[in-house]
A protein has these predicted regions:
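Charged, alpha-helix-forming regions
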Residues: 1-191
Length: 191
């Protein structure tokens, strides 16, 4: 039987690991935490009777070199050239407006007792920070707030993000792109 606690643990593990990968993929332990999160996700998927194979594939795959992760991250997500996939909500939803999503996220973080202004030099509506905030809400035992925040922010732009991400050519590990898309469908888009 799948308990809410098991679901929350797996979700928190995945959100936390993806947050680190979207903020600093080359950081020590980021990929290892991702592998452990995939172990938790595989367990949850198996309990739910859902395909656990994409998560399990990560467990046996060789770990990429930190420099390889950093290069691929820069190629996919940084810069302004055609094909770059933005990691901020404002890039997807507020191209011609003041980025209200940044202010809304900052307020949500502050209401939860967190301060992000200027941290890491990334906008408050960055996917990594949003996933990190979901982790905090789940750790605070407030999955309802996590779901509400997700629906108010990431759920509005992640489908377009996934479509854009899917169109990219992956130089390092193409299977990781398929896994990433599966993760978002399994955890994020059905939250």
């Amino acid at each position: 039987m799948v308990t809410q606690q098991l679901q929350d643990f797996a979700r928190q593990s995945v959100y936390d690991a993806l947050s680190a990968l979207f903020l600093q993929p080359e950081a020590k332990g980021a990929y290892e935490n991702y592998v452990e999160a995939m172990r938790a996700a595989a367990g949850l998927a198996a309990e739910l009777g859902t395909n656990a194979a994409p998560f399990e594939a990560v467990l046996d795959a060789p770990a990429p070199e930190p420099l390889e992760l950093e290069r691929e991250y820069a190629r996919l997500f940084l810069g302004t050239c055609e094909g770059t996939v933005p990691l901020a909500e404002s890039a997807w939803l507020h191209r011609d407006e003041i980025p209200l999503s940044q202010l809304e996220c900052r307020k949500a973080y502050a209401d939860a007792g967190l301060e992000t202004a200027g941290i890491l030099g990334v906008p408050e509506d960055h996917l990594g920070l949003q996933l990190g905030f979901l982790t905090v809400l789940i750790l605070k035992n407030d999955p309802a707030a996590a779901t509400a925040f997700f629906e108010a922010h990431a759920a509005k732009w992640l489908p377009a993000f996934v479509v854009s991400f899917r169109r990219q050519t992956f130089s390092a590990q193409p299977a990781d792109a398929a896994l990433f898309i599966y993760i978002f469908k399994f955890f994020c888009l059905r939250t």
